[in-house]
């Protein structure tokens, strides 16, 4: 009888665990929309990539390029002396890497005083 009770407890615990993990959605989709003259929009921790893209585009004015991230970080750097000029953006696993890479790309494209304009990390970034 004790073995039967122990087996039922294990089965009940397993069922509760399965239900608990199935009910909680994994929000790990993000997007950043990058436009001209420092325009941007960002969305992070969305359940679906399409929803994140849509939200980021709605926040960005003008014609914007969209980059996506999943369990990562995105950053946008612009030239402070000419915000409508050089810029750079990056998506990396860690925030420090995305900040550094976006800044490097801004300088690579001719920026003179590149600064971070925006950054975002999703659930695991």
Predicted stretch roles:
Residues 26-125:
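Secreted/extracellular ectodomain signature
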Residues 7, 23-26:
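Serine/threonine-rich, low-complexity intrinsically disordered segments
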């Amino acid at each position: 009888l004790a073995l039967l009770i122990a087996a039922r407890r294990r089965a009940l615990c397993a069922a509760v665990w399965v239900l608990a993990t199935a009910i909680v959605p994994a929000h790990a989709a993000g997007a950043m929309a990058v436009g001209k003259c420092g325009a941007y929009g960002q969305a992070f921790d969305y359940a679906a990539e399409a929803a994140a893209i849509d939200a980021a585009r709605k926040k960005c004015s003008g014609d914007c390029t969209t980059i996506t991230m999943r369990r990562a970080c995105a950053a946008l750097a612009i030239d402070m002396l000419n915000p409508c000029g050089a810029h750079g953006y990056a998506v990396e696993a860690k925030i420090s890497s995305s900040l550094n890479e976006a800044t490097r790309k801004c300088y690579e494209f001719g920026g003179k005083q590149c600064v971070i304009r925006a950054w975002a990390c999703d659930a695991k970034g």
